[in-house]
Amino acid sequence: MNDYIIETHNLTKKYGSQTSVSHLNIHVKKGRIYGLLGRNGAGKTTTMRMLLGLTAPTSGEVTIFGKPFQGNEKNILPHIGCLIESPGFYPNLTGTENLKIFAELRGLRSPKYIKNALELVNLVYSTCSQHFL
C-alpha cells in the first residue's frame, strides 16, 4: 500500500506563455504536516488550486488517497478541507452549480435549499438553473 496521501507527477500550470508551476513533484506522507513556502507569485496558491480541482493543470497528474484526482473528484473532495487565502468558489461553474456543491457537502440534497439561498440575495431561481440540480 502507498504511504502517500497526496502526490503530484510533473504538475505544470501555464497561463499563456507564463509558467506558474513547472513540473512539480510532491509526495505527502499520511499523518504528516507540510507547508508551501515561497515569495509572492511562486505558485503556492496555483498548486493548491490544482490539488483541489479549482484550476486545471496544463499537464501532469494529481493523485490523492492513491487515486487519480481527475475523474474521482466527487469521491475525494468530501474528505478534504481547505481554505486558500479566503473563502472562494469554483470559477468554472455557475452560481447554481457552486451552491449545489456546497449544499451537498453539508448533506443538503434538496433543490429547495438552493432556491432559498438565491431568494435570500434577491436572485431568481429559474427553470434553466434546475437543469443542474
Residue locations for each model-derived region?
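Short coil-to-beta microelement around the adenine-binding A-loop and adjacent beta1/P-loop entry
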Residues: 18-19, 74
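Walker A (P-loop) phosphate-binding loop of ABC-type ATPase nucleotide-binding domains
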Residues: 38-43
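Helix-to-loop junction immediately C-terminal to a conserved catalytic motif
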Residues: 52
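Conserved ABC ATPase "signature" region
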Residues: 100, 104, 111-128
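Conserved ABC transporter NBD signature motif
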Residues: 60-71, 75-76
